[in-house]
C-alpha cells in the first residue's frame, strides 16, 4: 500500500527534526559548550589558547612532548620544561592563572597552595578523573570514590601500618642483598665498573614488591608485574590516539596485545588469590605479606558485619588491589632510587655525609627497621629528591558541581590540574635555590621547609594520600644504606640527562654510573 502524501510528509518532518536535534546536540557538545566555558574562564582573568575543535591543545601537547624527548637536556635539575613541557609552556606564556584544552575539556592550572590544599581535602567535590585507558594499569583504591573508596581504604590500611612494615624489613633486606651481590659480580679486577643502574633498580623494586605482596607465590607475582610494565608502555605509546572516539575498540596489534596481557594478568592473580583462600580455609597460618594481610583484614571486615560477604572485597576487587600494589610499590620507589643515585653522584659531599651516617648507625651490622628510622640525613636527601623529581608531574581532578575555589568560580564537568613539579620548583615558594639540590632545607622537617605552606606533596595529600608512601621510603632507605655501605659512585661520561614521563618520571636513556667497591 502506497503511503499518503501526508504520511510521507510526517515521516520526513520527524526525520528532519530528529536530525536537527542530533546535529544541535553534537554542535553543542563539540563547539558551543567548550566556547561558553572558555568565555566564563576568561571573564575571571584566566588565560589560555582559544578552543580548537575536538582535540583542543592535545596535538600541540604531544608534539611538544615528542620534541623535548628527542634529545637530552643539560645536567640540571630544572626538569619541568622537559617532563611537563606543555604545562610549563602554558604557565610561562599565560601566567599562573591559566588553562589548557585537553580534548574538549579545559584544565584549569592551579598554582596557589591553598587552592590545591582545598582540592585535595574535598575529595567528594573534586573526584579523580577517570581515564578509560588507565583502568588497564591502575585498579582498586586509586580509582574509587565515596563509600566504596572508604571501605577499600579501611580494609587495606592495616597492611601498610608501620608495625606490619617492620615485619617486612627482612624481605627488603634479602632483595637488596641480592642487588649488592649482582653488582659485585660485575666489578673488574680493580674493584670498579661502569653500568646502567636503572634496570637493576627496577628489578630490585619489582623483586621487593613481588616478595612483599605474594610471599610464596613470588615468581608468579613477578611475571604479573612484568606484564603490567608492558601494559604501561603500550598505553603510553597509544595515549594521543586514545583521545579519538572509539579508537580503543579498533583491532590493532597493540590493542590485541593489551587484551592478551590483561587476560593473563587477571587469570594469574585469581589463581594466586584462590590458592591463598583455600589455605586459609584449611586452617593454615596467614602469610605476613601484603596479600595475606589484605585477606586477613577482608575476612575480619566480613565477620564484623555478620558474615555478609558483600561487606568485604570480592575476588575481582582483591585482584584490583593486588595490581595497585605494583604501581604504588614499584614505580615510585625505583624512580626515587635512580634519581637519588644520580644526584648523589653529582653531589659527592652529600654522598659522603649519607655514607658516614649509615656507617655510624649500622657499622658492620645489617640495616634494620629501627636503625633505618634514625637516618636523618638520608631522610633529608630522599625528601629533596622527591621535591626535584616527583614520581608524577601533576594530578587532575574533576569538578563535580559548580563551586567557588578561592577567587575562582569553577563549573561542573571542568577539570583542575595541580602541577606538582611546577609547585615543587617555584622560587616564590622555595626561594632562589628552588631548582638546586639542597637537602639541608629539610633539616627541620617538611613543615619547616615549606614554612607551613602547602607546597610539597610528592605522594599526593588529603584523605587520598598515597597509602604506600611509608613502604616506599622504608625500601629506599634500606637500598641506599646497603649501596652506600658497599660502593661509592659517580656519573659516567656516557650518562645522558633525560628525565622523561612513562607513567612516572624516569631516566629516558638510563643512569650510567661508575661504581667503586668500598674496601672494608
From Swiss-Prot:
CDD domains, A to Z: CYP72
Binding locations of heme: 466
Catalyzed chemical reaction(s): oleanolate + 3 reduced [NADPH--hemoprotein reductase] + 3 O2 = gypsogenate + 3 oxidized [NADPH--hemoprotein reductase] + 4 H2O + 4 H(+)
EC number assigned by the record: 1.14.14.-
UniProt cofactor(s): heme
Subcellular location: Membrane
GO cellular component: membrane
Protein name, per record: Cytochrome P450 72A68
Amino acid at each position: 500500500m502506497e503511503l499518503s502524501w501526508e504520511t510521507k510528509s510526517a515521516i520526513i518532518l520527524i526525520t528532519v527534526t530528529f536530525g536537527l536535534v542530533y546535529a544541535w546536540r553534537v554542535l553543542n557538545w563539540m563547539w558551543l559548550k567548550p566556547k561558553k566555558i572558555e568565555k566564563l574562564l576568561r571573564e575571571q582573568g584566566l588565560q589560555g589558547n582559544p578552543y580548537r575543535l575536538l582535540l583542543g591543545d592535545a596535538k600541540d601537547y604531544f608534539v611538544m612532548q615528542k620534541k623535548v624527548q628527542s634529545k637530552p637536556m643539560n645536567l640540571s635539575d630544572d626538569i619541568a620544561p622537559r617532563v611537563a613541557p606543555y604545562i610549563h609552556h602554558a604557565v610561562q606564556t599565560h601566567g599562573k592563572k591559566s588553562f589548557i584544552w585537553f580534548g574538549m575539556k579545559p584544565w584549569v592550572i592551579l598554582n596557589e597552595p591553598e587552592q590545591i590544599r582545598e582540592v585535595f581535602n574535598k575529595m567528594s567535590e573534586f573526584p579523580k578523573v577517570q581515564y578509560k585507558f588507565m583502568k588497564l594499569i591502575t585498579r582498586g583504591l586509586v580509582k574509587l570514590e565515596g563509600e566504596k573508596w572508604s571501605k577499600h581504604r579501611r580494609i587495606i590500611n592495616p597492611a601498610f601500618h608501620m608495625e606490619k612494615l617492620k615485619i617486612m624489613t627482612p624481605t627488603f633486606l634479602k632483595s637488596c642483598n641480592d642487588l649488592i651481590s649482582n653488582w659485585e659480580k660485575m666489578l673488574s679486577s680493580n674493584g670498579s665498573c661502569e653500568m646502567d643502574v636503572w634496570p637493576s633498580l627496577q628489578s630490585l623494586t619489582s623483586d621487593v614488591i613481588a616478595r612483599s605482596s605474594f610471599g610464596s607465590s613470588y615468581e608468579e607475582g613477578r611475571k604479573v608485574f612484568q606484564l603490567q610494565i608492558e601494559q604501561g608502555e603500550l598505553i603510553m605509546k597509544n595515549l594521543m590516539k586514545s583521545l579519538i572516539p572509539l579508537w580503543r575498540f579498533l583491532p590493532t596489534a597493540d590493542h590485541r596485545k593489551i587484551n592478551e596481557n590483561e587476560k593473563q594478568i587477571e587469570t594469574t592473580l585469581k589463581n594466586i588469590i584462590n590458592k591463598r583462600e583455600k589455605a586459609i580455609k584449611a586452617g593454615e597460618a596467614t602469610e605476613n605479606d601484603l596479600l595475606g594481610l589484605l585477606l586477613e583484614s577482608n575476612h575480619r571486615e566480613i565477620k564484623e558485619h555478620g558474615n555478609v560477604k558483600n561487606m568485604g572485597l570480592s575476588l575481582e576487587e582483591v585482584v584490583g588491589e593486588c595490581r595497585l600494589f605494583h604501581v604504588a610499590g614499584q614505580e615510585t620507589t625505583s624512580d626515587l632510587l635512580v634519581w637519588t643515585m644520580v644526584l648523589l653522584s653529582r653531589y659527592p659531599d652529600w654522598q659522603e655525609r649519607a655514607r658516614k651516617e649509615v656507617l655510624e648507625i649500622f657499622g658492620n651490622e645489617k640495616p634494620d627497621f629501627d636503625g633505618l628510622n634514625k637516618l636523618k640525613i638520608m631522610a633529608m636527601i630522599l625528601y629533596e629528591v622527591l621535591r626535584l623529581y616527583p614520581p608524577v608531574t601533576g594530578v587532575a581532578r574533576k569538578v563535580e558541581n559548580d563551586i567557588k575555589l578561592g577567587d575562582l568560580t569553577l563549573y561542573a564537568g571542568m577539570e583542575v590540574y595541580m602541577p606538582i613539579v611546577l609547585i615543587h620548583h617555584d622560587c616564590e615558594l622555595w626561594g632562589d635555590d628552588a631548582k638546586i639540590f639542597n637537602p639541608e632545607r629539610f633539616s627541620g622537617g617538611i613543615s619547616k621547609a615549606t614554612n607551613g605552606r602547602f607546597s610539597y606533596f610528592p605522594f599526593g595529600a588529603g584523605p587520598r594520600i598515597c597509602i604506600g608512601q611509608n613502604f616506599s621510603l622504608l625500601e629506599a632507605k634500606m637500598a641506599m644504606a646497603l649501596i652506600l655501605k658497599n660502593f661509592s659512585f659517580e656519573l659516567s661520561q656516557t650518562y645522558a640527562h633525560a628525565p622523561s614521563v612513562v607513567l612516572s618520571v624516569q631516566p629516558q636513556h638510563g643512569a650510567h654510573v661508575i661504581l667503586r667497591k668500598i674496601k672494608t
